Amino acid sequence: MAEITAQLVKELREKTGAGMMDCKKALKENEGDLEKSIEWLRQKGIASADKKSGRTAAEGLVHSYIHFGGRIGVLVEVNCETDFVARGDRFKDLVNDVAMQIAACPNVEYVSVADIPQEMVAKEKEIEMGRDDLGKKPANIKEKIVQGRIDKRLKELSLLDQPYIKDQNLTIEELVKQAIAELGENIQVRRFIRFNLGEGIEKAETNFAEEVAAAAKG
């Protein structure tokens, strides 16, 4: 396997316009082969998607999705650049897929890791640093373990980092980038809210056996 150097990453970025982390991942997946990495990025829609990421996306759809007999509901806003794309079936299918993903992911609270408040990140770090299993480890090792755990936790909260429910080999971010490549426009998941029936309502606890007995007495 070829060594994945900073120069190789830079060259791939210049050829594709993809982000640094995507380029590193592409090179790792393709054992440092530049041409295969370019093709890999194109197949995932990343190469063209990152070039469009700075363009204004002010059109789009607000979409609702109701699941499981009305027990779970989702509202999501996904933006694109033109009304023409927003009204097309490809974009509508993407928005519906994103809404279904949100319905299936009860732990997801933010669109991306970048949206998570810093105070929450700091709190997660404080919790992890205080865990008993890290007590005797050297400071540098402890820091790496803690950072790894925090990164994992933050990704659990991020919609874009979730494996796509219809294809576990894709993340939602990659799914969106594929649509960007196909439609030729910048597409952004802007915001969402998820409703669970009865969430936050304190329910009275009942004894099932007593309920049956009471019903039997008429």
From Swiss-Prot:
> Where is the protein situated, by its record's location annotation?
Cytoplasm
Q: Which UniProt keywords apply?
A: Cytoplasm, Elongation factor, Protein biosynthesis
Q: Which domain of life is it from?
A: Bacteria
Give a yes or no for keyword Nucleotide-binding in this entry.
no
PROSITE patterns cross-referenced by the UniProt entry = EF_TS_1, EF_TS_2
Keyword field contains Protein biosynthesis: yes
A GO term, aspect molecular function: translation elongation factor activity
Give me the ranges of the annotated region Involved in Mg(2+) ion dislocation from EF-Tu.
82-85
Query: Which GO cellular component terms are attached?
Result: cytoplasm
Q: Which Pfam families would you find in this protein's record?
A: EF_TS
Q: Which PANTHER family match?
A: ELONGATION FACTOR TS, POLYPROTEIN OF EF-TS, CHLOROPLASTIC
Record's HAMAP family?
Answer: EF_Ts (MF_00050)
Instruction: Report the sequence similarity comment from the record.
Output: Belongs to the EF-Ts family.
Q: What is its biological role? A: Associates with the EF-Tu.GDP complex and induces the exchange of GDP to GTP. It remains bound to the aminoacyl-tRNA.EF-Tu.GTP complex up to the GTP hydrolysis stage on the ribosome.
**Protein name (Swiss-Prot/TrEMBL):** Elongation factor Ts
Record organism: Synechocystis sp. (strain ATCC 27184 / PCC 6803 / Kazusa)
